Amino acid sequence: MTHVHTGGDDPGKVAMLGLTFDDVLLLPSASDVIPSDVDTSSRVTRNITLRVPLVSSAMDTVTESRMAIAMARAGGMGVLHRNLSIEAQASQVETVKRSEAGMVTDPVTCSPTNTLAEVDAMCARYRISGLPVVDAVGELVGIITNRDMRFEVDQDRPVSEVMTKAPLITAQEGVSAEAALGLLRRNKVEKLPIVDGNGKLTVLITVKDFVKTEQHPLATKDSDGRLLVGAAVGTGGPQWERAMALADAGADVIIVDTAHAHNRLVLDMVAKLKAEVGDRVDVVGGNVATREAAQALIEAGADAVKVGIGPGSICTTRVVAGVGAPQITAILEAVTVCHKAGVPVIADGGLQYSGDIAKALAAGASTAMVGSLLAGTAESPGELILVNGKQFKSYRGMGSLGAMQGRGQGKSYSKDRYFQDDVLKEEKLVPEGIEGRVPFRGPLSQVVHQLVGGLRAAMGYTGSATITDLQQARFVQITAAGLKESHPHDITLTTEAPNYYSR
């Protein structure tokens, strides 16, 4: 590339030309690849592979337990935001892990002395329809389900008076999934307790889990058949306690989530987490925008590096602080060191269309973290808003005033993401994000279908049978005229497409 003198005596003062998604297109290649036949699986961390290379953002209007469950069932993964109390975030991890399992190895139980009201509250919390009943030593003495409680008026009655009492249909430890399914089918029951030789409950198998497995064949699961889930932590305040609680709750990935990860606090947190819980949880560091920052995270032990400073639609870091790097260039810089170390890159932010996801992966990222494209789905926790007969959902940056002030939830846990946890007066906060709304998009499954469909099309055009192949694709830099030509033009739009909207 020809370097243009920008003034001054230091030719390296302007480091390089920065490119983002609208500045490039993927060049088509000779191909015998059919989009429906491509393999979209890719690593999100050193040790975890997703069927679909999509991760939902750790934002309080994008990912809570409902979104995380839906993302994992679709083949991706959700990262639970940290603008919650430690207990609430850990509880959401538990909700995801308990939502689906081939065998529930630590089933929620109740005692014969619990009241129906207490059982109903537990069922609502964990979104389950019934509980095994165990005595003080853990021996199975009965089971109580919605069917037992449906017509009970007195919610103070003890479980022992309403439950279906032992002997129950059970199986011994070591039973195969096929044999368990046979018992469920023959006895027409929905729950099969697994007991040891002393009659103590060890595992619970439910028919719903078999049904869910059939309904969601791409679901990403751990070795115990539970859905994968990630969770975000910071560096300030009680973040170590938060990380330990999340690990104990069963999180598969912990992301040290900050606006600037090339910082000693972040690097130390990553290293400390790897030393303490690295044998059971993968640790991700972010966000960065330079190869030096990526290298620092690798040396700290990160299992993946998250790239993106300021590309998000709700982020104002680049104009408030004047800092960042266009996302394609940031990814290209990070992968120069990450690929050599075998560490995956997560491209976080700036994705407006499915084609941008393909570009991010072609630049070298292994997965893409998506925020605005998912904020409008039914599963996002954002508020549903009706404006002139059209539905929208609220969407805000974690650096917005609302997020840092805790508006809508009483207390903020996100200030330290922007290193402002020492700011005691709300009027002294310096926001690096905005609040807004996005169109309601319907169920997540439909949105993910379109996003993955666009990725598959890109893989077909570039002759890429796998994501690794796609990373070898080449770009062409385009002009403003080329971008204008890329979008629909010289026509009045009469019917909207599910995967395109004009800006």
Language model regions located:
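Alpha/beta catalytic cores of nucleotide-metabolism and tRNA/nucleoside-modifying enzymes
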Residues: 1-30, 110, 172, 182, ...
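Active-site-adjacent beta->alpha loops and helix N-cap segments on the catalytic face
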Residues: 36, 85-94, 152-156, 200-220, ...
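Bateman/CBS regulatory modules and CBS-like beta-alpha motifs in cytosolic regions of diverse proteins
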Residues: 36-50, 57-59, 88-128, 134-135, ...
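Short beta-strand/loop segments at the ligand-binding rim of alpha/beta enzyme cores
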Residues: 49-56, 102-107, 222-232, 274-289, ...
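Catalytic cores of alpha/beta
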Residues: 66-69, 241-249, 283, 289-307, ...
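Glycine-rich phosphate-binding active-site loops on the catalytic face of alpha/beta enzymes
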Residues: 73-88, 197, 251-263, 303-321, ...
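Catalytic beta/alpha-barrel core
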Residues: 79-83, 109-110, 130-132, 170-172, ...
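Terminal amphipathic helices with adjacent charged low-complexity linkers/tails
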Residues: 82-97, 133, 137-153, 184, ...
